[in-house]
Amino acid sequence: MIKKRNTTKISVIGAGSVGATTAYALMLSGVATEIVLVDVNKSKTEGEAMDLSHGADFVKPVNILSGDYKDTEGSDIVVITAGAAQKVGETRLQLINKNINIFKSIIPEVVKYNKDAILLVVSNPVDVLSYVTYKLSGFPKERVIGSGTVLDTSRLKHEIGKRYKIDPRNVNTYIMGEHGDSEIATWSVTNIQNIKIDEYANKENLEYNDNFRKEVYENVKNAAYEVINRKGATFYAIALAVTRIVKAILGDEKTILPVSTLVENYYGIKDVYLGMPCIVGGSGIEKALSIDLNKTEASKLVKSAETLKNTLNNASCL
């Protein structure tokens, strides 16, 4: 449990597009009094810290530093965004061997100075790397969290909201499983302000059929690829997703977010990190929720878990 105190320290490992934008989003949110940026490119972190610090007059007081692992000591949360970037046409799972090797050098250094921190993994493939972090750190599963399908879920809400012309915040739904190509949309539990989506669509004379579900799902699943094809990388939305998770932890909100967590017995799935609805609070992941899926969704989730397990088993650098 993160103890309430006058200062809050967050370290961000990796100062690429995602890491730097995450630091910016955290700065704007006002959740931290100190943000430390660490990267192999020291000049880059120095430049990012300088640029961010020059805006200190416009936000709540925050000290932004460029440092090394020693400077992260005593962090409440360590956000890990370091790793090779996903290239055009490259899947998240194809990144695995590059990023596992990077994590083998990062995680021991993070743990050395942060025995009590919560580790929030953002680097892709996030579910696999969350599991790797869990194993390398020796931390309890509650304190090793992946950003999971928080962003994917936001994309799904956005797609439904756009088509139905409603506030996406009124859409209750989840993307579960891998943050990637095998993720699943939980249509069976999707509702609009507690009205089941099929009932809502029927009442409002809106489209809701197999074609609708397929189009929406494909748009969500391929969203990152579409962004990468156009601008080279995704970073704004994931930075906001990470900030949302951080706020839930630091505020001990006990809110439900579909983060990546160690699944131990859910539809027969064991020993793998997956995006699951979890209660997130001051202790990290306080509980993973075993929501009831229909047979098709459950089968797809099992396959998603198998995909991730096979990737881990086939990783040449483990």
Curated annotation (Swiss-Prot):
Role, per record: Catalyzes the conversion of lactate to pyruvate.
Lineage: Bacteria, Bacillati, Bacillota, Clostridia, Eubacteriales
Cross-referenced NCBIfam families: L-LDH-NAD (TIGR01771), PRK00066.1 (NF000824), PRK06223.1 (NF004863)
Pathway linked to the protein: Fermentation; pyruvate fermentation to lactate; (S)-lactate from pyruvate: step 1/1
Sequence positions that bind NAD(+): 18, 39, 44, 69, 83-84, 105, 122-124, 147
Keyword NAD: yes
UniProt-listed PANTHER family: L-2-HYDROXYCARBOXYLATE DEHYDROGENASE (NAD(P)(+)), L-LACTATE DEHYDROGENASE
Gene3D superfamilies in UniProt: Lactate dehydrogenase/glycoside hydrolase, family 4, C-terminal (3.90.110.10), NAD(P)-binding Rossmann-like Domain (3.40.50.720)
Catalytic machinery residues: 179
Keywords annotated in UniProt: Cytoplasm, NAD, Oxidoreductase, Phosphoprotein
Family: Belongs to the LDH/MDH superfamily. LDH family.
GO term, biological process aspect, one: glycolytic process
Classification via InterPro entries: L-lactate/malate_DH, L-lactate_DH, L-lactate_DH_AS, Lactate/malate_DH_C, Lactate/malate_DH_N, Lactate_DH/Glyco_Ohase_4_C, NAD(P)-bd_dom_sf
E.C. number: 1.1.1.27
Residue numbers of Phosphotyrosine PTMs: 225
GO molecular function: L-lactate dehydrogenase activity
Protein name, per record: L-lactate dehydrogenase
Subunit details: Homotetramer.
Pfam families, per the entry: Ldh_1_C (PF02866), Ldh_1_N (PF00056)
Organism: Clostridium botulinum (strain Kyoto / Type A2)
Main localisation: cytoplasm
GO CC entries: cytoplasm
Keyword Ion transport found: no
Reactions catalysed, as given in the entry: (S)-lactate + NAD(+) = pyruvate + NADH + H(+)
SUPFAM superfamilies documented for this protein: LDH C-terminal domain-like, NAD(P)-binding Rossmann-fold domains
Cellular localisation: Cytoplasm
